[in-house]
Amino acid sequence: MSSLFIAGHEFHSRLFTGTGKYASADAMMDSLTASESELVTLSLRRMDLKNQTDNILKPLQQQRIKLLPNTSGARTAKEAVFAAELAREALETNWVKLEIHPDPRYLMPDGMETLLAAEELIKKGFVVMPYVHADPVLCKRLEEVGCQCVMPLGSPIGSNMGLASRPFLEIIIEQSTVPVIIDAGIGAPSDAALALEIGADAVLVNTAMAVARQPAKMGKAFRLAVEAGRMAYESGLGERRVQAQATSPLTDFLGALS
């Protein structure tokens, strides 16, 4: 399986993960270890940045996993930029997952505010990874202003509904010149495999791993699914057909018998 490059950083795993909803820090680390994920997103709201022994942050830093702070909870571009600057100072990283969702019920991303924040953050030297609707026009605009990737949703956050937005994801993948990471709604390893099969460069999974009865085993399942999906894509999937096509035609064989 080929490596993925974002802003010059090489990732051997195409499975990115989150840190929310786990029953404990130990369960989180067991799951992440089994998944072999090399990038983990985490919310500033859930961390005690002044506490060097924070039970989420410290084990992640010890594992040398790349940390991707997110701006979850921001309702405007201004709030998102402020959160990103706090994260850069506290975690010494200029990478940020840009999330702006003013609606607390459905957590739908605000595309207009996201574009405004992305432009400002890029000017400030951030590597911006924006979480957005599966909107091909918006994703292209974000690419044009300098985002290093785009992160369209498969379905609503935490819904486990899979790739409900597949037709639009396929358009985004087809026209994008930056990595496409499908984020949100991936509820089963089969969803992750499908995402990679249709050409997504990576997926970000959190809820499906965190709420599983055995998070570590689910982490491994997602790792294998992502590897299989990417391998299938790189191998070249067969074309879908309406009509049947025999794998072993009998025409010549039957003619020789007559």
From Swiss-Prot:
Pathway in which the depicted protein is active: Cofactor biosynthesis; thiamine diphosphate biosynthesis
Catalysed reactions, as listed in the record: [ThiS sulfur-carrier protein]-C-terminal-Gly-aminoethanethioate + 2-iminoacetate + 1-deoxy-D-xylulose 5-phosphate = [ThiS sulfur-carrier protein]-C-terminal Gly-Gly + 2-[(2R,5Z)-2-carboxy-4-methylthiazol-5(2H)-ylidene]ethyl phosphate + 2 H2O + H(+)
GO MF annotation: an example: thiazole synthase activity
Enzyme active site: K97 (schiff-base intermediate with dxp)
GO cellular component: cytoplasm
Chief place of localization: cytoplasm
InterPro entries, alphabetized: Aldolase_TIM (IPR013785), Thiazole_synthase_ThiG (IPR033983), ThiG (IPR008867)
Residue numbers binding 1-deoxy-D-xylulose 5-phosphate: G158, A184, G185, N206, T207
Keyword tags: Cytoplasm, Schiff base, Thiamine biosynthesis, Transferase
Top-level EC class as recorded in UniProt: transferase
Family recorded in the similarity comment: Belongs to the ThiG family.
Function field: Catalyzes the rearrangement of 1-deoxy-D-xylulose 5-phosphate (DXP) to produce the thiazole phosphate moiety of thiamine. Sulfur is provided by the thiocarboxylate moiety of the carrier protein ThiS. In vitro, sulfur can be provided by H(2)S.
PANTHER family registered for this protein in UniProt: THIAZOLE SYNTHASE
Protein name from the UniProt record: Thiazole synthase
Origin species: Marinomonas sp. (strain MWYL1)
Phylogenetic classification of the source organism: Bacteria, Pseudomonadati, Pseudomonadota, Gammaproteobacteria, Oceanospirillales
